[in-house]
From Swiss-Prot:
Pfam families documented for this protein: SIR2
Primary gene name: SIRT6
Modified residues (N6-acetyllysine): 33
Changes seen on gene knockout: Monkeys die soon after birth and exhibit severe prenatal developmental retardation. The molecular developmental stage of the monkeys mimics that of wild-type fetuses at 2-4 months of gestational age. Neuronal differentiation is strongly delayed, due to hyperacetylation of histone H3 at 'Lys-56' (H3K56ac), leading to up-regulation of the long non-coding RNA H19.
Cellular component GO terms, alphabetical: chromatin; chromosome, subtelomeric region; endoplasmic reticulum; nucleoplasm; nucleus; pericentric heterochromatin; site of double-strand break
EC number: 2.3.1.-, 2.3.1.286, 2.4.2.-
Top-level taxonomy: Eukaryota, Metazoa, Chordata, Craniata, Vertebrata
Reported modifications of this chain: Acetylated at Lys-33. Deacetylation at Lys-33 by SIRT1 promotes homomultimerization and binding to double-strand breaks (DSBs) sites.
Active site per the UniProt annotation: 133 (proton acceptor)
Annotated protein name in UniProt: NAD-dependent protein deacylase sirtuin-6
Occurrences of domain Deacetylase sirtuin-type (ranges): 27-272
Role: NAD-dependent protein deacetylase, deacylase and mono-ADP-ribosyltransferase that plays an essential role in DNA damage repair, telomere maintenance, metabolic homeostasis, inflammation, tumorigenesis and aging. Displays protein-lysine deacetylase or defatty-acylase (demyristoylase and depalmitoylase) activity, depending on the context. Acts as a key histone deacetylase by catalyzing deacetylation of histone H3 at 'Lys-9', 'Lys-18' and 'Lys-56' (H3K9ac, H3K18ac and H3K56ac, respectively), suppressing target gene expression of several transcription factors, including NF-kappa-B.
Amino acid sequence: MSVNYAAGLSPYADKGKCGLPEIFDPPEELERKVWELARLVWQSSHVVFHTGAGISTASGIPDFRGPHGVWTMEERGLAPKFDTTFESARPTQTHMALVQLERVGLLRFLVSQNVDGLHVRSGFPRDKLAELHGNMFVEECAKCKTQYVRDTVVGTMGLKATGRLCTVAKARGLRACRGELRDTILDWEDSLPDRDLALADEASRNADLSITLGTSLQIRPSGNLPLATKRRGGRLVIVNLQPTKHDRHADLRIHGYVDEVMTRLMKHLGLEIPAWDGPHVLERALPPLPRPPTPKLEPKEESPTRINGSIPAGSCLEPCAQHNGSEPASPKRERPTSPAPNRPPKRVKAEAVPS
């Protein structure tokens, strides 16, 4: 549970702004905004989604800074509520909608701050996914960097040894690597994984549309990645119930439950949300399915650049690293703005934890 995850982190005073009031768009305005989102998705050639804890609350996993989030309740001296475990949590409508958007070629890359493993367990291809803060179900060999996707949480946090050894052999007949396996969960001051951050940065810079779902964008550098899309002339859509750090940069802001927004989006695009049939790991994306017929998305009078008084696409933005003293200190270490792209994919082995 995110409660146990949060409790396992080192003490850290500045967790950002917690418990901000939620905003709900009226039904007609919500429908109009989702219509605009569908038009943007269909007309864009390189769409990148960025997800946060808000997309998993419908599965019973609490978020962190929402009205009943883990850290919000902690600030109030109250115990957070939870309804499930990481192992028993099921992917939400949003998780499964993202799977289908990738299958038909409308989603090029997915960047996630979540550690709950639901993207991988939903069947989203790992070669199109960057998990910037780790995955509770994944451990990695410290020697050869092979990753193992388990069917239960690995049991440690903070890049610590899990007590298991790597079983991969470099070639037939050779002995196993036997390197020490470690969890992939970051603590506050740990550096983000180089490969995942490089891929996320490259995808964000190449995107002509970045869409954030269920994140307040307060954690750096993860929360600043969507701004790379804006600096390159792309558009930014923010879907969140609470105000976010980068609202002023958004071309379109949608205040509604993420599952409702994604369900309406899929309907406008003429796509079905697939049912989840149990956890399975997909290492590489399959050939894309045929796109559905072009939806009826004729232009409306009000463009997304004017909704909520947002700034037009292409306007000058401040650099990601520029912050004033009023913003929370960075819980994640800053990285160069242009890390080396096109790193080779990690070797991955999926198996159950030995009994």
